[in-house]
Amino acid sequence: LPVYNFGL
């Protein structure tokens, strides 16, 4: 999963 996915 992408790094900018803040726990979404």
From Swiss-Prot:
One Gene Ontology term, aspect cellular component: extracellular region
Top-level division of the source organism's lineage: Eukaryota
Major localization listed first in the record, in broad terms: secreted
Tissues/organs with expression: In larvae, detected in midgut but not in the CNS, ring gland, abdominal perisympathetic organs (aPSO) or thoracic perisympathetic organs (tPSO) (at protein level). In adults, expressed in brain, and thoracic-abdominal ganglion but not in corpora cardiaca and corpora allata (at protein level).
Name of this protein: Allatostatin-A4
Function: May act as a neurotransmitter or neuromodulator.
Example GO biological process: neuropeptide signaling pathway
Nucleus is among the record's keywords: no
Keyword field: Amidation, Neuropeptide, Secreted
Modified residues (Leucine amide): L8
Presence of the UniProt keyword Secreted in the record: yes
Signal peptide (from-to): none
Family listed: Belongs to the allatostatin family.
Compartments, as annotated in UniProt: Secreted
